[in-house]
Amino acid sequence: MKVISNFQNKKILILGLAKSGEAAAKLLTKLGALVTVNDSKPFDQNPAAQALLEEGIKVICGSHPVELLDEDFEYMVKNPGIPYDNPMVKRALAKEIPILTEVELAYFVSEAPIIGITGSNGKTTTTTMIADVLNAGGQSALLSGNIGYPASKVVQKAIAGDTLVMELSSFQLVGVNAFRPHIAVITNLMPTHLDYHGSFEDYVAAKWMIQAQMTESDYLILNANQEISATLAKTTKATVIPFSTQKVVDGAYLKDGILYFKEQAIIAATDLGVPGSHNIENALATIAVAKLSGIADDIIAQCLSHFGGVKHRLQRVGQIKDITFYNDSKSTNILATQKALSGFDNSRLILIAGGLDRGNEFDDLVPDLLGLKQMIILGESAERMKRAANKAEVSYLEARNVAEATELAFKLAQTGDTILLSPANASWDMYPNFEVRGDEFLATFDCLRGDA
């Protein structure tokens, strides 16, 4: 990494810990800053805070005392999840204390070029696909960002010959100023996180910050299926490379079941390692990045054909007696499950769905349920999900949890069938998060395989 003097002997407050805050604290300390970390979690429940204290970093836990800002900090590094209307953040802005993001801090010291990926859906899968293809092509791609590897930690190990492949959320992008990736991908834009941003327009503006400092020597990859992309493309200085599953574009596109870049055929959609129309979009974005990075067509095709998905995101788990299991626990809304269902033959599919009841009906899902072999329904939303199944004329059974649902599905399945966990609901009625829910599906698969 670059050793810069910008933060030498500067008093810096890190607001909010988690993985990114811990990494930022260590990086800034290494750069000679005088760091104070403030986290709302009590100290005795905060192993990360305890570890930082042992390293000599000042830590204040249990609350966010506004008076802490009376200490004349010269910078604040804010955790992405803390909104800008937080009293501490508002006070810092009133005092004209510059607020940095952790990803921008990483950018300042990075020797490696950055490929940034954002969007409403498909970020993690596309980020992982891109890194896999670049590495298969002999390059050194390092995953970082919102994918679980804090950018300010990864950047300390990265050298000029590496490439940081960085997943970026709207929370991380909303406050950047200097951040400039060489290649940026926006997978799609849907109205999400409006409780944080306030409006779809503000959410889009946050995502659009990924390209704010890009020039014509940089590349911006946009989803041409969306009308908003054409509008946004007119306002960037970057060179735009579109991708589309609906029309031929001057970039990556789907035509007659084949994925192309420009006029070069790369791979058949049926040969992709993960199913679903959304994964064709993810693969097209990946192809665009790979071609811009000089990866050979045969390597791109081979890598995409062997890509098995990301854990809990339409993850191909394996087979038992020629029955295939997919873990899509990350599908916490109707749209995500619709996209998952698009990749399967409903007549051979058993769907496990249901979860937290948010009061919404599932009428929009009904057309996607038509012809399903069977549903296994669970969770608080079971009654609403049953109504959708009845409208689609799909038979169903009820289960008490994911383990029981998976066992029931396996008993019903026949050779050649697929069992898909794609709940279309959040997990919090039964599980602390979608990862725990998905892990129960994986554990049950392992038990069933052991008994087979």
UniProtKB/Swiss-Prot annotation:
It is an enzyme of class 6 (ligase). It is found in: Cytoplasm. GO terms for cellular component: cytoplasm. InterPro entries: Mur-like_cat_sf (IPR036565), Mur_ligase_C (IPR004101), Mur_ligase_C_dom_sf (IPR036615), Mur_ligase_cen (IPR013221), MurD (IPR005762). GO terms for molecular function: ATP binding; UDP-N-acetylmuramoylalanine-D-glutamate ligase activity. It comes from the Bacteria. Pathway: Cell wall biogenesis; peptidoglycan biosynthesis. ATP binds at residues 119-125. Transmembrane segments: none annotated. Cell wall formation. Catalyzes the addition of glutamate to the nucleotide precursor UDP-N-acetylmuramoyl-L-alanine (UMA). HAMAP family: MurD. Belongs to the MurCDEF family. This is UDP-N-acetylmuramoylalanine--D-glutamate ligase. It comes from Streptococcus pyogenes serotype M49 (strain NZ131).
